């Protein structure tokens, strides 16, 4: 069993499409609800499932599946917050309280980053887990390289690389945000910055360039 932890804005939707293609009927999503490969809501995990992907903490799932292998993706914390900000402006999920507050109060990027739910979000998903606890860690900035490593590890053939939830207005690898703003966002996410650096140390040389 693979437990794929989808930290928001780390290319988790693109990776989800790939996992669904690879595992087909043996794939399950766990977000607000659990849904099987056909999109049907299920109350329990079917016995055939070999991969679960979604927004959940490692501890919550490892209690039920102690032998499962953890996999996840990490992203530069500042870029991740900026991406979340523009995504919520562009494609709002009105069920989420942060999205409602963003639009109702017309928050700036820094004001959005200062919200409690937006600070150190990556750390909250990973909990007390260390890099050694994960069978695979991908880096969003090197998505194709990380994906190739994942496919090789699990003996899958190459697959087309989808690009889901990408900002169509972003024309370069990084958002054009002032250094002073980046510094403020980094300061609001000190734990995430430390976690990101620690996790990147476990990656291959081709994936840690510019960390």
What are these regions (language model features)?
Residues 2-34:
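N-terminal pre-catalytic "stem/leader" segment of glycosyltransferase-like enzymes
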Residues 11, 76, 192:
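Short, conserved catalytic/metal-binding motifs centered on acidic residues
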Residues 14, 18, 145-149, 153, ...:
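Amphipathic alpha-helical segments that form well-ordered structural scaffolds
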Residues 35-73, 78-164:
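PAPS-dependent sulfotransferase catalytic domain
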Residues 51-58, 159-211:
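PAPS-dependent sulfotransferase catalytic core
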């Amino acid at each position: 069993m693979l437990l794929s932890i989808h930290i928001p804005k780390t290319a988790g939707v693109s990776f989800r499409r790939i996992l669904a293609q690879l595992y087909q009927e043996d794939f399950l999503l766990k977000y607000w609800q659990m849904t099987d490969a056909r999109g049907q809501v299920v109350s329990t995990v079917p016995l055939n499932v070999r991969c679960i992907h979604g927004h959940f903490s490692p501890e919550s799932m490892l209690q039920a599946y102690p032998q499962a292998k953890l996999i996840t993706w990490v992203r530069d914390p500042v870029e991740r917050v900026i991406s979340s900000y523009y995504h919520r402006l562009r494609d709002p999920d009105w069920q989420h309280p942060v999205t409602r507050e963003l639009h109702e109060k017309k928050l700036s990027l820094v004001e959005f980053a200062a919200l409690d739910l937006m600070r150190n979000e990556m750390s909250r998903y990973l909990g007390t887990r260390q890099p050694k606890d994960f069978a695979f860690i991908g880096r969003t900035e090197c998505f194709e390289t990380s994906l190739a490593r994942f496919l090789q590890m699990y003996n899958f053939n190459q697959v087309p690389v989808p690009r889901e939830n990408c900002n169509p207005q972003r024309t370069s690898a990084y958002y054009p945000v002032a250094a002073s703003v980046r510094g403020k966002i980094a300061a609001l996410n000190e734990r995430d910055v430390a976690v990101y650096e620690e996790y990147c140390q476990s990656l291959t040389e081709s994936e840690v360039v510019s960390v």
